[in-house]
Amino acid sequence: MPPTKLAHVVFQTNHRKAMQDWYCEVLGGHVIYENPRLSFVTYDDEHHRVAFLDYGPLTPRPRAEGGGMAVAATDHPGVHHVAFTFGSMGELLDNYLRLKARGILPFRSINHGPTTSMYYADPDRNRIELQIDNFASAAEGQAWMHSPAFDQNPIGVEFDPDELVRKFQAGVPVAELVIRD
């Protein structure tokens, strides 16, 4: 029997307070509980969605080479990224603009086909994906994943978030904005 939902993500970190503050800012969340070694953050009615443990010194992850991205190297085992879904294009872009005003920028923005996604690096250089679903139903998204377009390019095409904001604010329909070339 499958689970009913993904309940939470827990990060072990040397930077509990910085991580807690970053996730509160990025996800629009708030702290439910904290002490010097442990924090619980939520952004909805759940008791916690993200937690942070600081049990003592950890060896930092190596930086990826090239591209100037301050993200963890991808040739090490472990979690690649964690994704959070917004309810609409407007919500995703409002959050992008809010974070941009605070100096938090995505290191990569991709229309995957099933999702429109922006990737950020947290203070420990974990990758966090903020996304919207591009299809009205999961079944439509899954069907598109069996298309020749997805088979030829399963990763997607990069986009400029500022250009997407400009088009959205100009009134281009969301249905057109999420079409992957």
Where are the language model's segments positioned?
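Short N-terminal helix-initiation segments at or just after the protein's N-terminus
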Residues: N14-G28, L53, P57-M69, D94, ...
